[in-house]
Amino acid sequence: NVIIVCLLAITSCENNPNSYKPISSGNIHTVTVVMENALWNSEAGEHVRTVFASEFVGLPQQEPLFSLKQIPPSIFSDFTRESRNVLVVSKKRKDTFKITKNKYANPQVVVEVYGKTNKEIIDQINLHAPKAIKAIRQNEIKEKQRRIRKSVFKSEELKELSIDLSLPSAYKMHKKEKGKKLWLQRETEKGSVNVLIYLLENRKNQTPVNKAKAIKIRDSIAKIFVLGRNEKSYMITEKAYEPYFFETKIKGMQTVETRGTWEVKNDYMAGPFLNYIIQDTINNRLLVMEG
């Protein structure tokens, strides 16, 4: 029996190539860029920064898509190989692009871009950047979810609304309206981070949600639920900045995403928001979530 257990252990290790690899490390949304210093300072390096550190669309303040940390290949060894996201860019005889998962650590995404000249490297980046960005973003979402699962906010109210949502335990219930609206809040050094959840009836033959309708929905709810400090003050969508509007899917359900800036009418408060309106066909409702 002992021999069988040992054989099973050996077999499982051989069948799992990630079992002996170190755990990856790094800050969220950080990419280690492996490039020669001269190449990093060339037009190819400038293009890497333009594409992978571009401004995140829809925020009032500038925030890069990823934080880039460049190192030359000569020091890419040992612990530097354990970065969760790695982008290798180098000159080689053959144009190449590939994405490898868990190459040096686990979990990890390694993106490799090669070309004979700066122009060919830039062409490779232009051709494959969407795939690379998607792979890194998915890796970061999984890492963020892993960190959240260490200490999860638990709420009977979420269960009653048939909502499975993972949030850090630092969030507390700030305000609620039974069966319809929840306001969760996490205190920070500079203020607070808020998550709003509310349900709307999904009427038959209603018009699809477009940008104007999404703004109308959030403003109508905020006027009665998200009140300001002063009398007759409440949250509205700031009109000075045109919100960004996208169509996407969450768990296979049609979703519209709106990014913009909120402000408080009759008060001096403002900030960014990210709003999702989800067509919850399972429960025949519109699920609206905003942070």
Kindly give the residue locations of the regions a language model identified:
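Secretory pathway targeting signatures of secreted, lumenal, and periplasmic proteins
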Residues: 17-18, 38, 168-228, 263
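N-terminal mature-domain "stem" immediately C-terminal to a signal peptide or N-terminal signal-anchor/transmembrane
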Residues: 17-67
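N-terminal "mature-domain start" segment
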Residues: 22-26, 41, 50, 54, ...
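Sec-exported extracytoplasmic/periplasmic mature domains
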Residues: 53, 57, 134-137, 141, ...
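Solvent-exposed alpha-helical segments and adjacent loops
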Residues: 18-35, 90-153
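Sec-dependent signal peptide recognition
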Residues: 1-5
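Signature of long, low-cysteine stretches enriched in small and polar/charged residues
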Residues: 64, 71-115, 119, 223-284
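C-terminal motif of bacterial Sec signal peptides marking the signal peptidase cleavage site
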Residues: 9-12
